[in-house]
Amino acid sequence: MDLRTGELITAPQAMNGVYTWEINNPLYFTITRHQQRPFLLNQDIITVQVRFNHNLRKELGIHKCFLNFRIWTTLRPQTGLFLRVFRYQVLKYLDNIGVISINDVIRAACHVLFNVIEKTIECQLTHEIKFNVY
């Protein structure tokens, strides 16, 4: 849902993409929170934020696009190592596709979490997306 207008995101908006070779460093990855074994659980909770860079947003007609992934895993990774592997694998997946869109980034992250990185229990996605009104 578009946060500014409250309208649902249409399929053409979600599938609108840009070739990967046209934009340098299209995505920013940050770990906003890493909870190590909270409440005596045997799993870590890692929150990763993926931001679209300015040039990519301009091409897609987006004002703001943050994708927040909350990941439950039984691994005990170092924060920087997890981020480096996650970032590399997502960009590798997108390079193989050749196009970057909102749906492709979500699909790439799910592929990495459930097929590449082992012992992922669950992933929860929240987003902050605002399309250009004008």
From Swiss-Prot:
InterPro entries to which the protein is assigned, alphabetical: Gemini_AL3 (IPR000657)
Signal peptide bounds: none
The organism's place on the tree of life at top rank: Viruses
Keywords assigned by UniProt, alphabetized: Host-virus interaction
Coiled-coil residues: none
GO BP: viral process
Family, per entry: Belongs to the geminiviridae replication enhancer protein family.
Assembly description: Homooligomer. Interacts with the replication-associated protein (REP). Interacts with host proliferating cell nuclear antigen (PCNA). Interacts with host retinoblastoma-related protein 1 (RBR1), and may thereby deregulate the host cell cycle. Oligomerization and interaction with PCNA are necessary for optimal replication enhancement.
Function: Increases viral DNA accumulation. Enhances infectivity and symptom expression.
Protein name stated in the entry: Replication enhancer protein
Originating organism: African cassava mosaic virus (isolate Nigerian) (ACMV)
